[in-house]
């Protein structure tokens, strides 16, 4: 899970949306 958040901070300045996606992963 940490990797997901870290990726958000590295790839997205506003990790707000990214973090939400991390909490609610979308099925492929």
From Swiss-Prot:
This is Potassium channel toxin kappa-KTx 2.9. Keywords: Disulfide bond, Ion channel impairing toxin, Potassium channel impairing toxin, Secreted, Toxin, Voltage-gated potassium channel impairing toxin. Reversibly blocks voltage-gated potassium channels Kv1.2/KCNA2 and Kv1.3/KCNA3. GO terms for biological process: negative regulation of voltage-gated potassium channel activity. Contains 2 disulfide bonds. It comes from the Eukaryota. One of its GO terms (molecular function) is toxin activity. It comes from Pandinus imperator. Negative results: does not inhibit voltage-gated potassium channels Shaker B, Shab, Kv1.1/KCNA1 and Kv1.4/KCNA4. The keyword Glycoprotein does not apply.
């Amino acid at each position: 899970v940490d990797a997901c958040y870290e990726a958000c901070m590295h790839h997205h300045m506003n990790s707000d949306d990214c973090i939400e996606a991390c909490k609610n992963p979308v099925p492929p």
